[in-house]
């Protein structure tokens, strides 16, 4: 089965090909085509989870944070203030904190948008109910 019917069934536009031209040592022109990915194809490939990255970041952030704590604790247990390992531990620790904070921020923004959508749908429902009983 070819890919074209599947793309048409999914409603995805046909992928355009980006062409790059390169010259080979023998003065021949070689054209390389690279398919471009559309947002619909990305959604189909990820199962619609591209908007929930905060859920994927949390486990990774926790592991990075714990690794940062361990490396920093080992570095400072040897009283090596300012050494490469202590700086590396602090960088890993701060990146873990940053990932946790960004995940929490994304979660808050997502919750606010869900509340706003819920409020809009309730407003429309109440307005529709009033027009039915008026």
Curated annotation (Swiss-Prot):
Ranges that cross the membrane: 56-76, 84-104
Quaternary structure, per UniProt, is:
Interacts (via C-terminus) with TRPA1 and TRPV1. Interacts with TASOR.
- Mention one GO biological process in which this protein takes part, according to its record: epithelial to mesenchymal transition involved in endocardial cushion formation
What does this protein do, in the record's words? Answer: Plays a role during embryonic arterial endothelium differentiation and vascular morphogenesis through the ACVRL1 receptor-dependent signaling pathway upon stimulation by bone morphogenetic proteins, such as GDF2/BMP9 and BMP10. Involved in the regulation of nociception, acting as a modulator of the interaction between TRPA1 and TRPV1, two molecular sensors and mediators of pain signals in dorsal root ganglia (DRG) neurons.
> Which cysteine residues pair off into disulfide bonds?
none
What's the name of the protein? Answer: Transmembrane protein 100
Q: State the annotated membrane topology for this chain.
A: Multi-pass membrane protein
Q: Which organism is it from?
A: Homo sapiens (Human)
Q: Which Gene Ontology terms of cellular component type are present?
A: endoplasmic reticulum; perikaryon; perinuclear region of cytoplasm; plasma membrane
What keywords appear on the UniProt entry? Cell membrane, Cytoplasm, Developmental protein, Differentiation, Endoplasmic reticulum, Membrane, Phosphoprotein, Transmembrane, Transmembrane helix
Task: Please give the record's induction comment.
Answer: Up-regulated by GDF2/BMP9 and BMP10 (at protein level).
Could you tell me which residues carry Phosphoserine? 121
- Give the source's domain of life in one word: Eukaryota
Record-linked Pfam families: TMEM100
């Amino acid at each position: 089965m070819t890919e074209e019917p599947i793309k048409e069934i999914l409603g995805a536009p046909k992928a355009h090909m980006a062409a790059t031209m390169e010259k080979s040592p023998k003065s021949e022109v070689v054209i390389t085509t690279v398919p471009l990915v559309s947002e619909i194809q990305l959604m189909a490939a990820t199962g619609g989870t591209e908007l929930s990255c905060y859920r994927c970041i949390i486990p990774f952030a926790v592991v990075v944070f714990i690794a940062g704590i361990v490396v920093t604790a080992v570095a400072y247990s040897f009283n090596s203030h300012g050494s490469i390992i202590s700086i590396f531990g602090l960088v890993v620790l701060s990146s873990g904190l940053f990932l946790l904070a960004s995940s929490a921020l994304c979660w808050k923004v997502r919750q606010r948008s869900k509340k706003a959508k819920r409020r809009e749908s309730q407003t429309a429902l109440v307005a529709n109910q009033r027009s039915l009983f008026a």
